[in-house]
């Protein structure tokens, strides 16, 4: 209802904006017309900010509706204009870029102001402590005084506070999108990094949502990083609120990769690319788009067998890609679109079993000191797949025997002697991080039932000072996973 009220108030300006954009699309660069468009946009922003500043904490009207009714329309216009301008018309392109940059700057100021206002008015830093750092470092400060702050009641999980969090989340997404558009249209260096930074803030605001994951994947896809983009699109699909565009984006990436494999006659430079190709073939083999490029089924079967007979410690197994691809594989099986794919599920069982025994072998060799500690970085990615499968079939544990799981837990406990102890106590919140570990929703529901806690259980972990260790991220995951295994077997 609140969105409707705000929409009615800006309806007149929206009509003016659409008319001005239509006029701008009909001819070349018109400075006065673009100034009029930006003036309309600023007027809409002022109205929404005034409403935001005047509301009480027991009511809420969302200022982020301006994205769909105003900002996105203008961005789409500029993107089409850049495509239409002839390469020889350098002056027109330069003028259009200048106006577009001015527009993006006003948008960024608006969203930064909205975030600061919402954090202060609704005391959102009591939900997300990192907001304190945002309000102290944001380029636009809040206009709420200390007296007003002291009269605001202590934050609680009310509907209005949650709507405010969602609004802040959307503002971070839009700031990231504008940084991304700035990079693609204006060729500005570092804009992709800024976009990823805003998407990370969105993740820390509402980690269960999927839109920021989809946008991160779009950044990687723009940079032609196929493995990373597929991982993030799959992560978006199995989030609590998967965006509609994530599935289409994922299929586009899989089709593009499949065609690339066809172009090189299905000759692969590493086992990881074989794995990604098999997953792609399972997911899109029936789509008409790939029929002219389709690999014979007997060749796919040979590739599967060669992959599952290889050793995870070979040079061709890039640890980073193993993490991304095995995680994406796990995520896909928990997406509604793919969970009925029998061929994909069948290969997933075989791959998971192979990955489990490879992990167990790595842990044994590290324990017996026949292999360096760095081997742990080879086996850690597989834990994500193993845990997802084990927890999905809990309490029967499915295809992994309990005694095998106990062996893995035992060897991991033995391996702890290779790392320094630390008195610092870290917390792992599974409810917020389950997507990062590839844990399915049924796992969260199980823990909600067992613990009767809407937030989910927090596990104490005592890792070493991994900030200075050469394998810092792997060690951090190692300790987190060890605690999860111990919890499973307790």
Swiss-Prot record:
- One GO CC term of this entry? chromosome, telomeric repeat region
Keywords, ordered alphabetically: Chromosome, DNA-binding, Nucleus, Telomere
GO molecular function per UniProt: enzyme activator activity; single-stranded telomeric DNA binding; telomerase RNA binding
Q: Where in the cell is it found?
A: Nucleus; Chromosome, Telomere
- List this protein's GO terms for biological process: telomere maintenance via telomerase; telomere-telomerase complex assembly
> InterPro entries this protein is in?
DNA/RNA-bd_Est1-type, Est1-like_N, Est1/Ebs1-like, TPR-like_helical_dom_sf
Q: Main location per UniProt?
A: nucleus
Q: Looking at the Swiss-Prot or TrEMBL record, what is one Pfam family this protein matches?
A: EST1
Q: Which family does it belong to?
A: Belongs to the EST1 family.
Self-association and partners:
Interacts with trt1.
Q: What does this protein do?
A: Directly involved in telomere replication. Associates with telomerase and during its interaction with trt1, telomerase activity is promoted.
Q: What is this protein called?
A: Telomere elongation protein est1
